[in-house]
């Protein structure tokens, strides 16, 4: 964002002009959009433990075989690994949200995840369902009007949903 400000100032300075109302309005909109992005990311980050825990509870309620003997989340070690992976995915979704770009999610989290899960025998469909459950909860927190700067956040909420969709698709 600072680069955008520097660019506008440099252009005005090169012309020997003050910033125009149009330029100021564009910068103001960029700041407002950035504030919404910050608010949404803060809401997701502040509620990360709740998002992950509730998604896991819901998943294991729907698929109890995962936590029964022989299931992929059976034993404390496997359960902890499952919760850790869910938290990592959520963390990288929050990074993509603040950056407004999925490359950090793709490059540092999702690339190779399907292959890793297949090699470990982790059921991708179950992970995808857990991601979907996290998506629902995270969007509810991010879209809570008490947490977000006033204004239309529908485009941002839609963008956040696509990050979760990318993650769910990456594991199946």
From Swiss-Prot:
Pfam families: Phycobilisome
KW Thylakoid (keyword) present: yes
Gene3D superfamilies: Phycocyanins
InterPro entries in alphabetical order: Globin-like_sf (IPR009050), Phycobilisome_asu/bsu (IPR012128), Phycobilisome_asu/bsu_sf (IPR038719), Phycocyanin_b (IPR006247)
GO BP annotations listed: photosynthesis
Cysteines joined through disulfide linkages: none
PTM field: Contains two covalently linked phycocyanobilin chromophores.
Residues bound to (2R,3E)-phycocyanobilin 1: 35, 39, 149-151, 153
Binding site for (2R,3E)-phycocyanobilin 2: 72, 77, 82-88
Membrane topology: Peripheral membrane protein
Localization (cell): Plastid, Chloroplast thylakoid membrane
Sequence positions bearing N4-methylasparagine: 72
Cellular-component GO terms for this entry: chloroplast thylakoid membrane; phycobilisome
Keyword annotations from UniProtKB, A to Z: Antenna complex, Bile pigment, Chloroplast, Chromophore, Electron transport, Membrane, Methylation, Photosynthesis, Phycobilisome, Plastid, Thylakoid, Transport
Entry-linked NCBIfam families: phycocy_beta (TIGR01339)
Subunit structure: Heterodimer of an alpha and a beta subunit, which further assembles into trimers and the trimers into hexamers. The basic functional unit of phycobiliproteins is a ring-shaped hexamer formed from two back-to-back trimers contacting via the alpha chain subunits. The trimers are composed of alpha/beta subunit heterodimers arranged around a three-fold axis of symmetry. The phycoerythrins also contain a gamma subunit which is located in the center of the hexamer.
Extra facts: The light-harvesting antenna system in red algae and cyanobacteria is formed of phycobilisomes. These are composed of the phycobiliproteins phycoerythrin (CPE), phycocyanin (CPC) and allophycocyanin (APC). Cyanobacteria also contain phycoerythrocyanin (PCC). The phycobiliproteins all share the same subunit composition and organization with variations in the covalently bound open-chain tetrapyrrole chromophores.
Function text: Light-harvesting photosynthetic tetrapyrrole chromophore-protein from the phycobiliprotein complex (phycobilisome, PBS). Phycocyanin is the major phycobiliprotein in the PBS rod.
Protein name in the entry: C-phycocyanin beta chain
Protein species of origin: Cyanidium caldarium
Lineage: Eukaryota, Rhodophyta, Bangiophyceae, Cyanidiales, Cyanidiaceae
Name of the coding gene: cpcB
């Amino acid at each position: 964002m600072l680069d955008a400000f520097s660019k506008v100032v440099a252009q005005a300075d090169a012309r020997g002009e003050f910033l125009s109302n149009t330029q100021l309005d564009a910068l103001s909109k960029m700041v407002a959009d950035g504030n919404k992005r910050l608010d949404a990311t803060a809401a997701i980050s502040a509620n990360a433990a709740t998002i992950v825990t509730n998604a896991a509870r819901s998943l294991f309620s729907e698929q109890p075989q995962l936590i029964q003997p022989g299931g992929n989340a059976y034993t404390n070690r496997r359960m902890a690994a499952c919760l850790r992976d869910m938290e990592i995915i959520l963390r990288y979704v929050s990074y993509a949200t603040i950056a407004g770009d999925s490359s950090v999610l793709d490059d540092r989290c999702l690339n190779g995840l399907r292959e890793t899960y297949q090699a470990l025998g982790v059921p991708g469909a179950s992970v995808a369902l857990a991601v979907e459950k996290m998506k629902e909860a995270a969007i509810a927190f991010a879209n809570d009007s008490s947490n977000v700067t006033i204004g239309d956040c529908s485009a941002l909420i839609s963008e956040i949903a696509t990050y979760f969709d990318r993650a769910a698709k990456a594991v199946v």
